[in-house]
Amino acid sequence: MTKTISISDDVYEMLVKIKGKRSFSEVIRELVKKEGNFDLLMVAFGTRSEEEVEKLKREMKEVEEWMQSLCNH
């Protein structure tokens, strides 16, 4: 299933530059999956507030530190 989205010309040009022979879907999927990008996109599209993202980042950092402490024992 395909969907049509509207993006500004400058964003389109950026995607074209990094796309190479990949599809736009592949590029966008890769960008969303990279660490931190999903939350940034959620803020950009207004589905999460900056405060929610900061709270999520703090919680993620705490979990990462806890996991590292388990590995160091």
From Swiss-Prot:
One Pfam family hit: VAPB_antitox
InterPro entries named in the record: Put_antitoxin
Signal peptide interval: none
Highest taxon of the lineage: Archaea
Keywords from the UniProt entry: Toxin-antitoxin system
Record flagged with keyword S-adenosyl-L-methionine: no
Family per record: Belongs to the UPF0330 family.
Function: Possibly the antitoxin component of a type II toxin-antitoxin (TA) system. Its cognate toxin is VapC18 (Potential).
Name of the protein in question: Putative antitoxin VapB18
